[in-house]
Structure formats: C-alpha cells, structure tokens
C-alpha cells in the first residue's frame, strides 16, 4: 500500500502544508513588487528620470511571472478544501465561503481589470492612466491579502458566528465581527510588512549581484539603495508589529505561545527566554537549554517577575507540537534580526559614502536575498502548527475536518503535486532567475515590445508622446 506508513489525516496535512508553502512564496513577492512598481512609476512621473522607467520595465517582467504562478498555485488549494477537507468545507463554508467569494469579487476583478493595462499598455495609454492601472493592481494585491488573512484569522480567533443544530458555523448578526476578528489586524499588518521586506531583499540581492559585476551600473545602484532604505526603515517596524502580534496571541491562543517559548512547565516568578534547546515532546522537557532568566516574562508581560503558565496547564490532547514551533519561531526571529542588522549596516555604509563600494555588504545582501521567503514560511509554520489540533481554534479539530479518504489515495495525490509543482514552478523560478541575471539597462522595453502596431487604441486618451515627463539627468542618491 502506498501510504508510507502515514495516516490519511497526516498525508492530507502534509499535502496542504506543501502546497500552501509553495503558494505563498509568490504572493509574498507579488504583493511587495506591485507596490514597488507603483513607487517606481510614480517617481518617473514626478521626476522625469528615465532610470525609474527602466527599473519599472525591468521588474514588471518578474512581477508578471510571480503573479501568474501565485494565481495558479492558489487555485489548487481551493480544490483541496473540497477533496481532502470536505467536512471542514461543509461545516465552516457558511462563514469562509462568502469571505473567499469577496476576494474574487473585489481583488481578483480589480487585478484582472487593470493587469493587462499595467503589463502591456505602456505604449497604448497615457502615462498617468498607466500609473493608475499600476496603483489598482497594487491595491488589488493588498485587498486579496485582506480577505485571505481575514479567513485565516477567523480560523485562529473565531468570532461573530452562530452554530446550527447540526454543528455548522453560520454568520452571526454582523459580518464585521467575523472579518475584523481579534487577531486579524495584527496578522494583516505583520503579513503585508513581511511581503514588503521579502521584496526589498530580493531587489537588494539583485542590485548587489549586478554591483559586484559592474559597480558603476546606475540602475543597480538605485535598486540597491532603495532596498537598503527599506531594510533599515521597515525591519524595526516589522519587529514591533511581531511583538504586538505575539501579545495578541498570548491572550487568545496561549498554548501557541507556550510552545513557541518552549515553556513545558509553568513559571511562578518570572519565565526565562530560551535561546536554544532541544524540545522533547514525549517527555515534556527542553534538553540542553540555554536561557536568559526572566526575559520571557519581560517581553510577554512587560514585568520582570510576572508569572507565566506552561503547557502543564493545557490538556495534552490540545497541545501543539513544541519541537516544530520552537524552531520555526526562532528561525523567523533570527532572520528578522539579520534583516535589521543588514539594514543598519547599509545605513553606516551610506553615512560613510561607501554604499556602492563595500563589497562585503553586497555579498551579505546577496546571501540575504531569499531570507524573506524563508522567514515567511517559518512564520506561517508557526501560525498554523500552533493552531493544532484545531482547524477552527477551540471548536473544530483537524481530525474532524478531514475527508473520509484512504491513505493511499491521498499519498498518490501528494506525490503528483510534488512532481508537478517542482516541474512547473521550477521552470517558472528558473525563468525569474534568468530575468534577474540580466543587468538592468537604459531603454529596457519591459513586456511591451510590439513592432509595426499602433501605440494605443483609438480614443481620446493622450498617448505617451503627449504625457511623457521631461527627462532629467540621472543621479543616484
């Protein structure tokens, strides 16, 4: 039997973890890139410097590939709700179904309406109309994140619902209570900032790569400079947002925080912060622990000696996996601190006038290029594993949510997904690397290379020749 010794439930969880992790790589880039493209085009319109237009055309190609792969991989997860998690869909569909439909009716239609203009309309509409299309696509990516995060947050902190006699979740008197559930604002801010940081480090890595090869490339200098500003300014904000999110989680999902901190036992007079340790879920202890006394109480309660309960106060059947949470959380935090360190290093280099000369800084930025993706996956692993053993926290368990499938059937689909994903998205990822390997240059035509065709459709909208900003000499600050 092709089940690899796992139950159907475990295989279904593995399959969803694989597909959702693979999927979120692309939205975390497209959300940030859409806003970055809007900034670049806005700067071009304001300053008239063709360098910004060149960078827009350079990155819009990467955005197109990432956006397409994000859409395709996202559709797969919708089908998984019906195949592997049909009981969950049946019981919670009354709440999450409309929320996901709202995403289609708002974000998807907004993106679909303006994406073609953004990608292919630079020579067909006026620059300000094109900029409006870019802004609408950026807004669409944010609105999409809004609805998806609302769905996930409701599963984490469910409010505003009613239970039917047969155990189904139904909308209560106010949809606002469902949408703006207790963890939603914190998770939305944390997720969107993570997407911006992810994009900043991808842009910074690309700029660093080309600076290492051609230090005088003005386009690479501008990319790198903008990315380092983002790292220095946004990384501290993300750390603060993460701290606020953690305090909210402590209030509504204390078992998740206990597992993240490695607190198997309660601490009556201040809990230590464990920097390192090997969690032993079976024996409920943390081996080889390296701790700083009382700091966990200081961070979580803002009181050096505040008591903190441990997992010994939670029913063993309702505890998440400490081993996974302990390390995924530390991986996320460690990368966040590394991002902050690189941003501060960039500030020092800028202050000394060496931002484009310190090759060690460029190499470090290159190494940190994929760090945002790793941190995002680690963060979502912390969020989702910490919710276990529930799909709807405290109300519907994961075991109760699964479809009545045989393990070999789920294993076969898991293998198929792995093979297809690595083949299809492997090619897409390779193509993105190919695009980034080509240095940005003046006169980049983006996706709008069309010979012998009209520059724009018939109508009264001014063409680019009438609305194009006056070009000014290039400088990199």
Q: Residue spans of the language-model regions?
A:
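Polytopic transmembrane helical bundles with strong interfacial aromatic enrichment
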Residues: 2-477
């Amino acid at each position: 039997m092709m089940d690899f010794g796992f139950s159907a439930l475990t295989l279904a969880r593995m399959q969803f973890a694989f597909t959702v992790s693979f999927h979120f790589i692309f939205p975390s880039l497209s959300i940030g890139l859409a806003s970055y493209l809007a900034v670049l085009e806005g700067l071009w319109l304001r300053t008239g410097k063709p360098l910004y237009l060149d960078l827009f055309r350079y990155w819009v190609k990467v955005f197109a590939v990432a956006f397409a792969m994000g859409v395709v991989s996202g559709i797969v997860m919708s089908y998984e709700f019906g195949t592997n998690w049909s009981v969950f869909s049946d019981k919670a569909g009354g709440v999450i179904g409309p929320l996901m439909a709202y995403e289609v009716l708002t974000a998807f239609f907004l993106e679909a309406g303006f994406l073609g203009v953004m990608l292919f309309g630079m020579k067909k509409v006026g620059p300000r109309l094109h900029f409006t299309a870019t802004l609408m696509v950026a807004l669409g990516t944010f609105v999409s994140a809004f609805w998806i995060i609302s769905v996930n947050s409701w599963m984490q902190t469910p409010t505003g619902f009613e239970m039917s006699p047969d155990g189904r979740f139904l909308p209560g008197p106010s949809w606002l209570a469902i949408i703006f559930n207790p963890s939603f604002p914190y998770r939305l801010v944390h997720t969107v900032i993570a997407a911006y940081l992810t994009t900043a480090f991808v842009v910074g890595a690309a700029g660093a790569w080309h600076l290492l090869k051609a230090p005088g490339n003005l386009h690479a200098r501008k990319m790198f400079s903008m990315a380092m500003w983002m790292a220095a300014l946004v990384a501290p904000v993300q750390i603060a947002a993460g701290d606020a999110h953690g305090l909210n989680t402590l209030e509504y999902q204390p078992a998740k925080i206990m597992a993240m901190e490695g607190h198997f036992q309660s601490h009556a007079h201040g809990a230590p912060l464990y920097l390192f340790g090997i969690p032993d879920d079976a024996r409920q202890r943390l081996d080889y622990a390296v701790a700083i006394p009382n700091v966990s109480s200081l961070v979580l309660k803002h009181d050096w000696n505040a008591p903190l309960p441990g997992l010994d106060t939670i029913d063993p059947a309702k505890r998440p996996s400490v081993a996974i949470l302990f390390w995924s959380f530390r991986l996320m935090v460690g990368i966040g601190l590394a991002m902050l360190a690189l941003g501060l290093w960039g500030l020092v280099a800028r202050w000394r006038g060496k931002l484009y000369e310190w090759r060690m800084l460029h190499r470090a930025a290159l190494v940190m290029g994929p760090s945002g993706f790793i941190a995002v996956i680690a963060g979502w692993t912390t969020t989702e594993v910490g919710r276990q053993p529930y799909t709807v926290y405290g109300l519907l368990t994961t075991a109760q949510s699964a479809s009545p499938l045989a393990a070999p059937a789920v294993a076969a689909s898991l293998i198929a997904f792995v093979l297809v994903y690595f083949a299809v998205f492997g090619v897409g990822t390779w193509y993105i690397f190919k695009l980034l390997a080509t240095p940005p240059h003046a006169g980049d035509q983006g996706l709008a290379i069309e010979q012998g065709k009209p520059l724009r459709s018939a109508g009264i909208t001014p063409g680019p020749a009438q609305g194009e900003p006056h070009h000014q000499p290039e400088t990199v600050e």
